[in-house]
């Protein structure tokens, strides 16, 4: 597979064309950002850890019948993926109250949500990724009602699969965000990544934060926490 020019450079990943029109290469960088890119630092090993963590999770999801863009690992920080037409909407599933939900509603951090909540946010850093609803998505042409229904169905299936996976590793899956795209055959496919950058994970017993909140909140030992999560799951680093 020939790696060609860079198509897009995000906050933590770069996207490259290949000689296959239906495939791209994602490069996971060591860049670590918070607050919509206003704070950026380099954390050694982060690109490698997130790339291998993501590959492990995506393969678990594929095995559970969830279509993902993952194809194969190419290097410590590179992965081959299906080319998707991304829908500019983040799907957020919450099992416990944390982050923006606590700020918006004034509820206690760590409160168990029964049932889980499912939320949508417009993927737009300049606007602060605003909270939206399904009618906004359809009205503004960001996606169709059918696509949204499939995105929700897949998001909840991901929650079911990964909640058990993390629970078995002594971790609480507090919340997570997912992004989806449309493949060349018209199907909705899980894209982007699943790593401690885009979810909240707490130790089941101590409630120690094991995710990017360690960076956001200045708790330190960010990569050490990521690696501990990976080791608990059996991710080969």
Curated annotation (Swiss-Prot):
Pathway: Purine metabolism; IMP biosynthesis via de novo pathway; 5-amino-1-(5-phospho-D-ribosyl)imidazole-4-carboxamide from 5-amino-1-(5-phospho-D-ribosyl)imidazole-4-carboxylate: step 1/2. One of its GO terms (cellular component) is cytosol. It catalyses: 5-amino-1-(5-phospho-D-ribosyl)imidazole-4-carboxylate + L-aspartate + ATP = (2S)-2-[5-amino-1-(5-phospho-beta-D-ribosyl)imidazole-4-carboxamido]succinate + ADP + phosphate + 2 H(+). Keywords: ATP-binding, Ligase, Nucleotide-binding, Purine biosynthesis. InterPro entries: SAICAR_synt/ADE2_N, SAICAR_synt_PurC, SAICAR_synth, SAICAR_synthetase, SAICAR_synthetase_CS. It is an enzyme of class 6 (ligase). PROSITE patterns: SAICAR_SYNTHETASE_1, SAICAR_SYNTHETASE_2. Belongs to the SAICAR synthetase family. NCBIfam families: purC (TIGR00081). This is Phosphoribosylaminoimidazole-succinocarboxamide synthase. The lineage of its organism: Bacteria, Pseudomonadati, Pseudomonadota, Gammaproteobacteria, Pseudomonadales. The gene is purC.
């Amino acid at each position: 597979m020939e790696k060609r020019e860079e198509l897009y450079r995000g906050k933590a990943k770069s996207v490259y064309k290949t000689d296959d029109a239906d495939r791209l290469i994602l490069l996971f960088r060591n860049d670590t950002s918070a607050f919509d890119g206003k704070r950026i630092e380099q954390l050694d090993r982060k690109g490698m850890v997130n790339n291998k963590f993501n590959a492990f999770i995506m393969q678990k999801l594929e095995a559970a019948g969830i279509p993902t863009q993952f194809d194969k690992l190419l290097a410590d920080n590179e992965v081959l993926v299906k080319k998707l037409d991304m829908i500019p909407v983040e799907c957020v599933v919450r099992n416990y109250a944390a982050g923006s939900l606590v700020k918006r509603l004034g509820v206690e951090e760590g409160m168990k949500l029964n049932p889980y909540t499912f939320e949508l946010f417009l993927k737009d850093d300049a606007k602060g990724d605003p909270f939206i609803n399904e009618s906004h998505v359809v009205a503004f042409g960001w996606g169709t009602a059918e696509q949204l229904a499939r995105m929700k169905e897949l998001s909840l299936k991901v929650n079911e699969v990964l909640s058990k996976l993390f629970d078995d590793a002594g971790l609480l899956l507090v919340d997570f965000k997912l992004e989806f795209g449309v493949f060349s055959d018209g199907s909705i496919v899980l894209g982007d990544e699943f790593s401690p950058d885009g979810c909240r994970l707490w130790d089941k017993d101590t409630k120690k934060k094991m995710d990017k909140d360690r960076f956001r909140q200045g708790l330190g030992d960010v990569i050490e926490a990521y690696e501990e999560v990976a080791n608990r799951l059996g991710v080969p680093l």
